[in-house]
């Protein structure tokens, strides 16, 4: 009898331990969602000051007048605050009324890259790992990430199906960047067809293949946005990453007019996504949005097209937040310097996952 009672007690103990472990893995408010959005190579100058008139003037062709350019008429205003609101009206309403943004150095707030390379793959890997790996991640080649990313860990810790952790990216190399184990999460990057039950989205698949961009392995951001929204509506992910690319592509091409237009389009994408999320009961008041960039660019008319370790300014980034569990502080002022390495832990913390327990060297979460 004692043996049977002992076995029963031991079994109850094991069940209790199992429940505690399960609770630890699932310790997140039901329905909470994190959304990460990146704007490739988006300079602090445009984010905080809108149109840079010196750079626009440097792109004038013979016979052109600055005041006659369509983008000047559309985006110019006397003050940086007015110009940035003309460029990204929704974004600035969101971060000033419902969130915050760090990185305006004029106000004593800075965000820095931790990696030494100051270009895309190292920057994105730093975002998703919470730490730089300069010796191993030192090119933009499509090489599988040697480390497990925060996206993969969130899927495992929250016991989610792969389609509940999804990445939509304009650049094809995100297939390798976001996963150490191929297929661990859902990834749609570059000119990949979207698998969806929605017949209206099926029309996008041949269209994005036919609408070739000037850049190899990259689709236009409009397709990335539509694909992400289709997946959001049909699969209802808990972790979503949307990576836009045109803010970098047009800069490399020296098309400052197109660059400004891409900022403005991205603002409409953010608006449409945020408004849709807030219209859905399962996402309203439960969605944690973080917006940032993988690197900065040069400060001047001679180097704004470029980035990399030799370009001063390319290490300067910014981070914006809209979260029900973060203070609504608008622009950060006179604050300690933040690092891009803190993004991974910040995302994980919103789902009550301790990323620093997984990667002790990673940056700490931002609160």
Regions found by a protein language model. Name each.
Residues 8-18:
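Bacterial N-terminal signal peptides
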Residues 24-100:
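Active-site-proximal N-terminal segment of extracellular/periplasmic enzymes that hydrolyze or transfer
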Residues 34-36, 44, 265-305, 347:
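Metal-dependent active-site segment of extracytoplasmic phospho-/sulfohydrolases and closely related
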Residues 58, 292-322:
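Histidine-centered active-site microenvironments of extracellular/periplasmic hydrolases
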Residues 72-178:
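Long, well-ordered early-domain segments
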Residues 151, 155-157, 325, 334-367:
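Non-catalytic, well-ordered alpha-helical segments in soluble enzyme domains
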Residues 180-182, 226-272:
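Active-site His/acidic residue clusters
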